[in-house]
């Protein structure tokens, strides 16, 4: 006989229908059937039952000698009345259940059942009817109902014989279940010709009755619906059939079963045996009182301790292993095993028997019961050959069964080699314990230890990511759009930066004016940004990224006012809740880097998460234990440096290094971070803590990036951690340069993480290398206030005092001067001294300055190498070198990029950082190439000679924006005085303007344009030799004299002549004003300063760029509209007002308000128009038409009466002399 479980292979059990009336367990699976065997004969169906509420070990019970003639015989008569009905139902199930026989077990079942049928041909319906209602077997007893025809003496004889055969086979456990039969078993079966007892250990009958009853109700439909016509010996599933059970019984009778009736034939009793799980009597609840059975079982088990050891080892017989289908089917013996007080000592034996006799593939998976007292080691069920295995229904058992299942399930399906599953007791016992360990793993994975597992998983996935995890979104390179200003329905501005608001208010533009002309305000603000000398720097200064700030002052400027509205410290856990919030100039991204450092170690007063917890918190939400360390999530919640000065000695470092900075990285843009005095002390005192910190910091890259803003700001500078920017770093390439900084930082940290246990980095190295990298995120972008962090292995870290407070303060200084003490330390921090901090800060700044210089030298070397390569490229392009030389130059031309120049910093920067670094370098190279092109162009324009040989007696007479102005004598003509404009090209922000000026002057030979004589390029300095106008500029005359309308008309006429010439050449001067109108002593007027002039051709007949001086600027330029040559006419009109009133309109206004007034007021109003003639007012009105289409051009104005009736140029000579004398007197 074998057991088949359709739904759950492990939920097979046999019990009496009377016993099943108590328990109704709806959670048990249905479909268990008992078949009499593959051979012909009546079939019996059984219903699976859940285990009783109390289960005891059957390790000793199965082999107990008391099983012969034990209370099983007394219970037989109680169930005879149910034989007929249950037999009919079992017949139906046998037909359907026999189809699930495993192929690997089919032949073995056939052989065993054939032996049973040949020895017991008289199996009859009566036998089935007598055996159907047998009670559950108690521990220490065996189900001898299958052999009920004999008496007790026969049972004892057979028991003795089987015991002998078991002892013989004890040493032959190596027989595998699917190959050979142990000789002892074969001998016992053939010699005794007895059927293996369908032995079932009695246990608490009340529990079995309830379980069987519930299973009968639940599973009757499934059994009736099961296919009846299936062949009895066909099965490919893992479920065990009753034929499998029968084969197990026939092959392992001497192992697990103690046959009670040696005279009965084997086949007849197997076929006539009636399962105790009789589904035919679902309503019967009559059952023997369980208490007596429990007592007997317990007594029996206590008496049979000594016998059990021997017999349990004997039960590891390979005969059971031949039919692995029972290996996982828990019998009622098993359940008694589980509740037995001796389970620990007997578990190994029981497990051995289970693995050898039954397949764990049939172990119950959905059993449920809260009353069982399974231990972790009673995983495998002791599957005796009894055909009454019941369903274990305990949660613990359920988990353990699953584990054992996974361990031993292969034996039930595959005919493994000899000795694979015939394990000895200790070995199987170990398997069982390993199953419980697996259960512990599951519980740790899904239970209360989930944090540990998740943290470990986060560690394993930390380096994948960015990653993350390591997913990073790069910032736009060289993006200049720092603010988007809109206008709402009320006419108010939205998104207007506070700096612009301040600028507008400081410029005198009221809110009312802004609402009246919102678009004009936006235009003039945009113009004001664009017209600054360095637009990028001006834009950054708007956000208080001042390039002129001291680099040694750290990231904090304690006295600087907030640049942006201060955010609240609205962080989870109130990390900085108690400290005041003050906005800081540094960007959120830079503070993010500071957060990475600040949160490295938790305050001892705070709950310190373990390394695992901290790693976990990086991938999960911050731990509530670390609530006080959480970072405020407001991006603008900055804290000034003074608030972070530690005010007490650092507490002793904790015994274990902690890396709990992860909390701050859930809010990467937060900038006010609680930090304890002991954080840096911990890292400085324990080198290993440095490595503990590194993994968390690496995580932050990956994970700490929740918002795109924080990720972008983080990325804004990471790769050039160890390469300082050039002393005057241009802002455009510096943005991508700084972008790669954080990646370089994380890559720098990864080596520390990987080698944390084997090669700890000294605290000083961590101090100088890793910790300093974080605050310096956007250094290259804004000349930020920290030196580039050195590599961890060779950083000239500042000396750290041996005392813990000094170490702490030094570490804090190295990390971030701006640190907010945790609220828990606020009181103590108030009273602590700060002199140590100041000393350490000084030392730190000195060390960082040295480091910056070192890195700057390195960068200079790289740049020199690139210049050399580029020179080689130019030589190749010009054909100066042959093909070989050209190829060599091209090979050298792409030098090792700066990001790759520092591979020691680690490869953890990620693709984004590397790509950013490459793009940044490409932009720098492009700019460098552009500069070289400009220089090359200048070389073609300029004279290659030495100007010192031609011009002598240089006297500096002025300093312009682009260089100094000198007077010199021409060697060829000593009476000829020339003006030399000397400019350092390296300091010129817009070199193309210089070229433009030279080209315009060189190609514009006109009496009213300053003559261009020559130009020289000498050692990087550009010398422009021009005609000298000794009278000075018109500004001197305007400021020192009062001009008549005739004199004004002369200036306008001469200027218009020059403008007409320029406009005819397609050149727009775009900067006509009194400063650019020069006079000589004779009163001749010439236009100069063509730096802002623009070329206009047929294609580009209009210009839209913002150039010029605001007060003389035309409205179309202020409004950023297209414009043409008539902008010079507007400027001429403003210059007329300047000559009339001594100053241009709105000169007393701020430039921004002047632009606003120009854009909104239109034509400026004269102070005293009545004192002017009609001609000049008409001429002025024509020049100052807001609509440039109505504005006159230079040629039209030259024909105006005001110009035609003006004075001669000689009238200006007295004014020039007066202005010169006054100027000289002022200089004296």
Swiss-Prot record:
E.C. numbers: 2.7.11.1
Domain of life from the UniProt record: Eukaryota
Compositional bias segments (type: Pro residues): 787-805
InterPro entries documented for this protein: CRIB_dom, CRIB_dom_sf, Kinase-like_dom_sf, PAK3-like, PAK_BD, Prot_kinase_dom, Protein_kinase_ATP_BS, Ser/Thr_kinase_AS
Keywords: ATP-binding, Cytoplasm, Kinase, Nucleotide-binding, Nucleus, Serine/threonine-protein kinase, Transferase
Biased composition (Gly residues): 568-579
Pfam families, per the entry: PBD (PF00786), Pkinase (PF00069)
Protein kinase domain segment(s): 951-1203
Record-level GO cellular component terms: cytoplasm; nucleus
UniProt keyword annotation of Protein biosynthesis present: no
Binding-site residues for ATP, renumbered to this chain: 957-965, 981
Chain positions covered by the region annotation Disordered: 1-382, 405-468, 543-829, 865-917
Residue stretches making up the CRIB domain: 473-486
Active site: 1071 (proton acceptor)
Subcellular location(s) of the protein: Cytoplasm; Nucleus
A biological process term (GO) from this entry: fungal-type cell wall organization
One example GO MF annotation: protein kinase activity
Enzyme class, UniProt record, top EC level: transferase
Primary role: MAP4K component of the MAPK pathway required for the mating pheromone response, and the regulation of cell polarity and cell cycle. Phosphorylates histone H2B to form H2BS10ph. Required for hyphal formation and virulence.
Family: Belongs to the protein kinase superfamily. STE Ser/Thr protein kinase family. STE20 subfamily.
Name of protein: Serine/threonine-protein kinase CST20
Organism: Candida albicans (strain SC5314 / ATCC MYA-2876)
Gene: CST20
């Amino acid at each position: 006989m074998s057991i088949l479980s359709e739904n759950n292979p492990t939920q097979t059990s046999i019990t009496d229908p009377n016993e099943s009336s108590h328990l109704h367990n709806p959670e048990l699976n249905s479909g268990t059937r008992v078949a009499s065997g593959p051979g012909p004969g009546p079939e019996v169906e059984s219903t699976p039952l859940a285990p009783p509420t109390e289960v005891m070990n059957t390790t000793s019970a199965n082999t107990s000698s008391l099983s012969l003639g034990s209370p099983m015989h007394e219970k037989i008569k109680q169930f005879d009345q149910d034989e007929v009905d249950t037999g009919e139902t079992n017949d139906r199930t046998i037909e359907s259940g026999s189809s699930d026989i495993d192929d690997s077990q089919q032949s073995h079942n056939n052989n065993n059942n054939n032996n049973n049928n040949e020895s017991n041909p008289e199996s009859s319906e009566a036998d089935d009817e007598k055996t159907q209602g047998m009670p559950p077997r108690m521990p220490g007893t065996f189900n001898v109902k299958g052999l009920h025809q004999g008496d007790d003496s026969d049972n004892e004889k057979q028991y003795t014989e089987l015991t002998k055969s078991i002892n013989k086979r004890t040493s032959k456990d190596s027989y595998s279940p699917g190959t050979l039969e142990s000789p002892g078993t074969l001998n016992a079966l053939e010699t005794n010709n007895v059927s293996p007892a369908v032995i079932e250990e009695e246990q608490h009958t009340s529990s079995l009755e309830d379980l069987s009853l519930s299973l009968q109700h639940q599973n009757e439909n499934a059994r009736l619906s099961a296919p009846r016509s299936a062949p009895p010996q066909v099965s490919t599933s893992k479920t065990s059939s009753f034929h499998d059970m029968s084969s197990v019984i026939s092959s392992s009778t001497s192992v697990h079963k103690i046959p009670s009736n040696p005279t009965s034939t084997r086949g007849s009793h197997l076929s006539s045996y009636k399962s105790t799980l009789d589904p035919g009597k679902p309503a019967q609840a009559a059952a023997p009182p369980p208490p007596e059975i429990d007592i007997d079982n317990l007594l029996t088990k206590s008496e049979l301790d000594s016998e059990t050891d021997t017999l349990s080892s004997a039960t590891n017989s390979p005969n059971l292993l031949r039919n692995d289908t029972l290996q996982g089917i828990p019998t009622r013996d098993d359940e008694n095993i589980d509740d037995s007080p001796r389970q620990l000592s007997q578990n190994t034996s029981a497990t051995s028997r289970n693995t050898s006799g039954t397949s764990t593939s049939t172990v119950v998976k959905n059993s449920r019961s809260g009353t069982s007292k399974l231990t972790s080691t009673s995983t495998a069920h002791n599957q005796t050959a009894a055909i009454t295995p019941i369903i274990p229904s305990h949660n613990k058992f359920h988990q353990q069964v699953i584990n054992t299942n996974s361990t031993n399930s292969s034996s039930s399906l595959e005919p493994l080699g000899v000795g694979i599953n015939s394990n000895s007791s200790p070995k199987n016992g170990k398997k069982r314990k390993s199953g419980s360990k697996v259960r512990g793993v599951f519980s740790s994975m899904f239970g209360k230890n989930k944090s540990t597992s998740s943290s470990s998983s986060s560690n394993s996935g930390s380096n994948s990511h960015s990653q993350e995890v390591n997913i990073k979104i790069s910032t736009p390179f060289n993006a200049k759009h720092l603010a988007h200003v809109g206008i709402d329905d009320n006419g108010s501005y939205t998104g207007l930066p506070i700096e612009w608001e301040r600028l507008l208010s400081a410029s005198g533009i009221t809110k009312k004016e802004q609402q009246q002309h919102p678009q004009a305000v936006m235009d003039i603000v945009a113009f004001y940004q664009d017209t600054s000398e360095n637009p990028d720097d001006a834009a950054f200064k708007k956000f208080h990224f001042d390039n002129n700030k001291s680099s040694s002052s750290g990231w904090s400027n304690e006295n600087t006012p907030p640049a942006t509205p201060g955010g609240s410290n609205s962080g989870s856990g109130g990390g900085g809740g108690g400290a005041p919030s003050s906005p800081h100039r540094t960007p959120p991204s830079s503070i993010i880097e500071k957060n990475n450092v600040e949160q490295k170690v938790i305050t001892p007063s705070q709950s310190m998460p373990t390394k695992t917890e901290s790693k976990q918190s990086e991938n999960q939400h911050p731990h509530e234990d670390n609530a006080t360390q959480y970072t405020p999530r407001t991006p603008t919640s900055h804290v000034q440096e003074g608030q972070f000065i530690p005010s007490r000695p650092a507490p002793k470092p904790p015994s274990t290094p902690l890396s709990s900075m992860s909390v701050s990285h859930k809010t990467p843009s937060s900038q006010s971070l609680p930090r304890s005095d002991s954080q840096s002390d911990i890292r400085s005192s324990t080198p290993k803590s440095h490595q503990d910190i590194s993994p968390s910091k690496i995580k932050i890259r990956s994970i700490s990036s929740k918002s795109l803003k924080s990720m972008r700001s983080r990325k804004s500078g990471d790769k050039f951690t160890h390469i300082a920017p050039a002393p005057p770093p241009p802002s455009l390439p510096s943005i991508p340069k700084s972008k790669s900084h954080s990646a370089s930082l994380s890559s720098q940290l990864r080596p520390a993480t990987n080698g944390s246990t084997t090669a700890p980095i000294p605290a000083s190295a961590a101090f100088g290398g890793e910790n300093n990298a974080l605050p310096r995120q956007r250094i290259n972008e804004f000349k930020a206030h920290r030196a580039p962090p050195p590599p961890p292995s060779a950083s000239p870290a500042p000396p750290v005092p041996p005392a813990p407070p000094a170490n702490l303060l030094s570490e804090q200084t190295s990390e971030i001067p701006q640190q907010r003490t945790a609220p828990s330390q606020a009181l103590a921090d108030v009273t602590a001294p700060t002199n140590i901090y100041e000393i350490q800060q000084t030392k730190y700044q000195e060390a960082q300055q040295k480091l910056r210089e070192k890195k700057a030298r390195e960068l200079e070397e790289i740049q020199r190498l690139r210049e050399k390569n580029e020179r080689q490229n130019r030589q190749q392009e010009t054909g100066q070198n042959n093909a070989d030389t050209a190829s060599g130059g091209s090979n050298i031309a792409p030098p090792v990029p700066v990001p790759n120049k520092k591979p020691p910093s680690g490869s953890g920067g990620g693709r984004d950082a590397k790509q950013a670094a490459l793009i940044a370098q490409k932009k720098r190279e492009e700019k460098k190439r552009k500069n070289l092109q400009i220089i090359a162009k200048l070389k073609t324009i300029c004279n290659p000679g030495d100007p010192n040989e031609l011009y002598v007696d240089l006297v500096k007479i002025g300093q312009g924006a682009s260089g100094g102005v000198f007077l010199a004598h021409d060697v060829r003509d000593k009476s000829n005085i020339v003006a030399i404009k000397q400019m350092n090209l390296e300091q010129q922000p817009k070199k193309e303007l210089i070229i433009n000026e030279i080209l315009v002057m060189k190609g514009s030979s006109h009496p009213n344009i300053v003559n261009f004589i020559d130009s020289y390029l000498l050692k990087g300095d550009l010398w422009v030799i021009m005609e000298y106008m000794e009278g000075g500029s018109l500004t001197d005359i305007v400021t020192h004299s009062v001009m008549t309308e005739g004199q004004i008309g002369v200036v306008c006429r001469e200027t218009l002549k020059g403008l007409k010439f320029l406009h005819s050449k397609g050149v727009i001067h775009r900067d006509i004003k009194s400063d650019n109108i020069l006079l000589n002593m004779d009163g001749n007027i010439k236009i100069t300063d063509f730096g802002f002039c623009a070329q206009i051709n047929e294609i580009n007949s209009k210009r839209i760029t913002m150039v010029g001086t605001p007060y003389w600027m035309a409205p179309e330029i202020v409004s950023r509209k297209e414009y043409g040559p008539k902008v010079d006419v507007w400027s001429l009109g403003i210059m007329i007002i300047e000559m009339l009133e001594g100053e241009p309109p709105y000169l007393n206004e701020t430039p921004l308000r002047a632009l606003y007034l120009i854009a909104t007021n239109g034509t400026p109003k004269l102070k005293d128009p009545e004192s002017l003639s009609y001609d000049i007012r008409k001429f002025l009105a024509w020049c100052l038409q807001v609509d440039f289409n109505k504005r006159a051009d230079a040629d039209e104005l030259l024909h105006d009466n005001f110009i035609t009736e003006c004075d001669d140029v000689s009238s200006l000579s007295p004014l020039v002399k007066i202005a010169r004398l006054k100027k000289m007197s002022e200089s004296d």
